[in-house]
């Protein structure tokens, strides 16, 4: 039985978001072909003093790739920093060459460009706005705003350059020119270290550079974001941005997928700018720097993200991270009292829980997606921006083929070594498809969802206005209070099936004593907690990690598991079993009360199912 690949089946009629290569932008393809895996750069040659990191390529390789591109526009008499320059526009780069002998050349890669404008018509001045790297260390990406001011000889040249620049770098973006877009920013002022408002002030300067329309909403308490997700006017915004931890995003998704028009609503691009304690989604997509996230919002490229349906009886929740039971949820929920300590609260909570360890009995039912042991699971390529597995029509077959290919190549390599025919290592190193396949969502629909707005506008909002409502509300005492109905996502009713029916459909069961479990659909639950290194954003699979109370158990070993989770190495422990599954059922024993959490939020303690819905929502991602 398979419930993973699509949702056009009788019981699952939700269709995954389109990830077809036909929807890739030509600009993105060119950038991948010319500078694969590059961080967006401003590079000065020949000295190669770069403002940004140059990633995994040398300046010579970069220049060679760019030299192969066609020149779209050229002007040899432009003033930059009071010096005469030649300006070239190519498909992926703006080039500024100083004309004097020995002058250097600047390359502004298109992925850093956020906007431009004619700043002074009387002096023919033009300003380009960008967001470039602060550091050469690509593992610690931080970005800053940077402006490039040019002066042209006359109005004709000024307008000609403006037309070519906008056409090449801004109009080609998936959601069109940023100045014609409308985004809504929702922030939680109490999230994490309470820095969300400060973060907004910083990134809003970049939004101003792009001339994007911004509406700011500050949440006023629990479930406010859920209510916004349920009733906001879908036609007013093309992107929803969150400044918070994962909790606010979780709330909004549960409102969004409760709408009667959820099939249309789920296509709207969503962006998460980390401002909380966990920030699992941001870490899973490699966007932990707020300014880098804002750049990604402006650029507007998206990838689909899996969502899981969690069910207990008639109650349902949507999950974007995980279902946890045992020590992980114990630490997460019980350490809330130490939230003022920031990330330290989890370390303190873990230490206290290990000293007073709880052992839980129960059953863990799961429907295998792949019959792989954890050594084989470790060989699955990690998710990337152009991910072969996430883009596949059948991720399970793709994973099986990758593992099989690795085994064949390893066998061949071993044979070559034994026969001494080749002393070098020719083992298979999995290379993901880098042709560029970031899904742009439904571009035509997105472009028609909003009208042109000339100037940026910031509106502080406590409650939506009456004309923002698009759905009938179940009112209580006032217009500000209403009940959001359960999620409309269709799921299979596994909790109603007997064990005989489950076994007949290929389910398996683990029974005994457990320290805890983590069932996740993304790699990270926090910056220092990589739950499953081989989890993918859109493969339709749940990574089930089980911490066993077996003969090899010790508190020292458990402490090692928790500390090594910061790198993902904990899955190698003898205490850990790992499975790639399509669905699972947790049956905790009633001999002691425990904690079950969905995305870090406490739910009732009892029999619980989890089912993954592939490519359910649209997430803003980077393109490099």
Curated annotation (Swiss-Prot):
Regulation: Inhibited by N,N,-dimethylsphingosine; this inhibitor increases sensitivity to cisplatin.
Binding site for substrate: 244-247, 332
Class in the EC hierarchy, top level: transferase
Disruption phenotype: Cells grow more slowly on solid media and are more sensitive than wild-type to the antitumor agents cisplatin and carboplatin; both effects are exacerbated in sgkA and sgkB double knockout. Exogenous S1P reverses the sensitivity to cisplatin.
Residues that, per the record, bind ATP: 188-190, 219, 251, 276-278, 339, 345, 599-601
Active-site positions on this chain: 246
Compartments reported by the entry: Cytoplasm; Nucleus
Alphabetically ordered keywords of this record: ATP-binding, Cytoplasm, Kinase, Lipid metabolism, Nucleotide-binding, Nucleus, Sphingolipid metabolism, Transferase
GO annotations of cellular component type: cytoplasm; cytosol; intracellular membrane-bounded organelle; membrane; nucleus; pseudopodium
Stretches the record annotates as Disordered: 1-54, 407-445
Described purpose of this protein according to its UniProt entry: Catalyzes the phosphorylation of sphingosine to form sphingosine-1-phosphate (S1P), which probably acts intracellularly as a second messenger perhaps by promoting cell proliferation. Overexpression of sgkA leads to increased growth rates on solid media and an increased resistance to the antitumor agents cisplatin and carboplatin.
Name of the protein described by the UniProt record: Sphingosine kinase A
Organism the protein comes from: Dictyostelium discoideum
């Amino acid at each position: 039985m398979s419930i993973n690949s699509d949702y056009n089946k009788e019981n699952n009629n939700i269709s995954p978001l389109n990830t077809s290569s036909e929807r890739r932008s030509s600009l993105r393809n060119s950038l991948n072909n010319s500078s694969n895996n590059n961080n967006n750069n401003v590079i000065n040659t020949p000295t190669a003093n770069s403002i940004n990191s140059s990633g995994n390529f040398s300046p010579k390789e970069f220049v060679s790739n760019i030299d192969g591109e066609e020149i779209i526009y050229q002007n040899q008499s432009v003033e930059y920093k009071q010096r005469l320059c030649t300006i070239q526009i190519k498909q992926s780069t703006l080039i500024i060459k100083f004309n004097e002998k020995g002058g250097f050349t600047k390359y502004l890669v298109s992925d850093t460009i956020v906007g431009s404008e004619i700043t002074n018509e009387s002096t023919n001045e033009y300003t380009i706005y960008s967001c470039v790297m602060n550091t050469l260390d690509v593992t610690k990406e931080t970005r800053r705003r940077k402006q490039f001011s040019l002066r042209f000889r006359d109005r004709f040249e000024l307008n000609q350059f403006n037309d070519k620049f906008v056409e090449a770098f801004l109009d080609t973006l998936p959601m069109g020119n940023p100045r014609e877009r409308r985004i809504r920013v929702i922030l939680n002022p109490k999230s994490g270290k309470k820095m969300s408002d400060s973060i907004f002030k910083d990134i809003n300067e970049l939004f101003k550079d792009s001339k994007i329309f911004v509406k700011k909403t500050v949440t006023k308490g629990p479930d406010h974001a859920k209510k916004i997700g349920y009733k906001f006017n879908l036609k007013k915004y093309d992107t929803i941005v969150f400044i918070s931890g994962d909790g606010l995003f979780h709330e909004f998704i549960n409102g969004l997928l409760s709408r009667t028009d959820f099939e249309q609503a789920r296509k709207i691009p969503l962006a998460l700018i980390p401002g909380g304690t966990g920030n699992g989604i941001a870490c899973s997509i490699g966007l932990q720097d707020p300014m880098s996230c804002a750049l990604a919002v402006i650029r507007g490229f998206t990838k689909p993200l899996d969502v899981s349906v969690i069910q207990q009886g008639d109650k349902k929740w949507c999950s974007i991270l995980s279902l946890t039971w045992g020590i992980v949820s114990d630490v997460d929920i019980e350490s809330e009292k130490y939230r003022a300590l920031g990330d330290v609260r989890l370390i303190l909570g873990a230490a206290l829980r290990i000293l007073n360890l709880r052992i839980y009995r129960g059953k863990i039912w799961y429907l295998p997606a792949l019959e792989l042991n954890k050594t084989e699971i470790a060989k699955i390529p990690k998710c990337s921006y152009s991910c072969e597995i996430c883009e596949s029509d059948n991720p399970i077959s793709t994973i099986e083929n990758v593992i099989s290919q690795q085994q064949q190549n390893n066998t061949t390599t071993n044979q070559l070594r034994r026969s001494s025919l080749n002393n070098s290592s020719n083992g298979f190193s999995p290379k993901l498809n880098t042709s560029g396949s970031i899904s742009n969502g439904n571009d035509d629909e997105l472009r028609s969802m909003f009208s042109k707005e000339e100037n940026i506008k910031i509106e502080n909002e406590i409650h939506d206005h009456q004309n923002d409502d698009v759905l009938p509300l179940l009112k209580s005492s006032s217009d500000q209070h209403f009940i959001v109905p359960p999620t409309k996502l269709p799921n299979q009713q596994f909790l109603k099936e007997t064990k005989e029916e489950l076994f007949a459909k290929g389910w398996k069961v683990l029974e005994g004593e457990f320290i805890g479990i983590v069932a996740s659909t993304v790699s990270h639950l926090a910056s220092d907690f990589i739950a499953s290194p081989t989890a993918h954003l859109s493969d339709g699979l749940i990574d089930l990690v089980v911490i066993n109370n077996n003969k090899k158990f010790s508190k020292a070993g458990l402490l090692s598991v928790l500390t090594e989770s910061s790198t993902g190495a904990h899955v190698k422990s003898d205490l850990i079993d790992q499975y790639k599954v399509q669905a699972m059922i947790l049956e905790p024993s009633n001999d002691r009360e425990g904690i079950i959490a969905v995305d870090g939020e406490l739910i009732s303690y009892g029999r619980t199912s989890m089912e993954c819905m592939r490519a359910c929502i649209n997430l803003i991602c980077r393109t490099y």
